[in-house]
From Swiss-Prot:
EC code(s) of this entry: 2.7.4.9
Family the UniProt entry places it in: Belongs to the thymidylate kinase family.
Catalytic activity: dTMP + ATP = dTDP + ADP
Name of the molecule in the record: Thymidylate kinase
Amino acid sequence: MKGKFIVIEGLEGAGKSSAHQSVVRVLHELAIQDVVFTREPGGTPLAEKLRHLIKHETEEPVTHKAELLMLYAARIQLVDNVIKPALMQGKWVVGDRHDMSSQAYQGGGRQLDPHFMLTLKETVLGDFEPDLTIYLDIDPIVGLARARGRGELDRIEQMDLDFFHRTRARYLELVKDNPKAVMINAEQSIELVQADIERAVKNWWKSNEK
């Protein structure tokens, strides 16, 4: 039986790491033990090198389109070499970010051309998409305060507040239009967030159980 692909999305400081643990806990309760973890950008040797280029300052400015193309290069390496093979083996994959991140950050935050964004997505990924996307919604002010509390910010995390407001607005549009996505209020206590995530996964499981 083919596995399923669950993705966790959200702004910086939304609590994706904790959400990851909540999803895995539910899967284990459902007797799904063979779970593969991924992160974007990253997850393969080449993708991890691209991650470093994307997230850190370089000797020359990185254009918005170059940034996006590096993200897609890393993504297809991960999808073709890790995610798809795992799914075909019946394993479940839980991912920290996927394509919705690019649509929100580069499409919303960077304000790249929507037609260019859609064409690139369809060319690289085709009809491949997560079975379930869990979006952790948080006010950028709250999220960035949490992120700063963790230490030094990377190149993208250092963007101005307007960038993150645009990114969040695009996330909200994407989730609204995606029947396979659920939104969780990430400004609640960690206990309430975890409970909402576990409930969302269980409800999704029941509605898709065959």
